[in-house]
Amino acid sequence: MSPGAAIQRVTVKGRTINIVTLHTWPQAYGFGVGSADQAASAANKEGDKYREFEIKYICAQTVNNPAYASCQDWLMMGDFNSRSRADNWYYGYPENDTRLLVHNHILDHTDLKDIIAERYPGSFISSTYGNARIDYMYASPSMYARIVNALTVMDKWTTATQSPYVSNFYDPSDPRPILADFELKQ
């Protein structure tokens, strides 16, 4: 896995919440592909296929892991570097487009809900400074039911400015933060 993923378990008001954070492979070419073969790898959509491998592994080790079968409260979030069929009305990709593989797996093989897509149906809310949503927050049904508010933060503190030091880098970051408030009663 590159860049990586982690699971954290926190207890709030007697509830154990399992939080999965991740950042999947960011390139169009496959992981470990040498520079001479990167164009061919990208043409074969190997970056998308590697991200699918990553999310299958992450789900198998966390939300779908029998060791966690008794755990109901889950959040999964991060930079997925992929598109979701929940936004495909906006993108217009073919249904079998490899850019949709990651979220197809989550939506078809877990009970996690895409917080932003569920809260704002029919609205496309970019998580980057362009017109892409590649950053997501998912919640299990028990956590989704406790959402008070959720939004993608777009304010003066999250407005990108090009770095004076690196031509393809932006401050503060290329993805915008997703903020969700939950009501956790005992």
Q: Where on the chain are the PLM-derived regions?
A:
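Extracytoplasmic/cell-surface-exposed regions of Actinobacterial cell-envelope-associated
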Residues: 8-11, 56-59, 66, 113-115
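A short secondary-structure junction signal
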Residues: 20, 30-34, 86-90
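Active-site metal-binding loops of divalent metal-dependent hydrolases
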Residues: 24, 79-80
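A long, amphipathic alpha-helix that forms part
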Residues: 42-70
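Metal-dependent phosphoester-hydrolase catalytic domains
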Residues: 64-75, 82-186
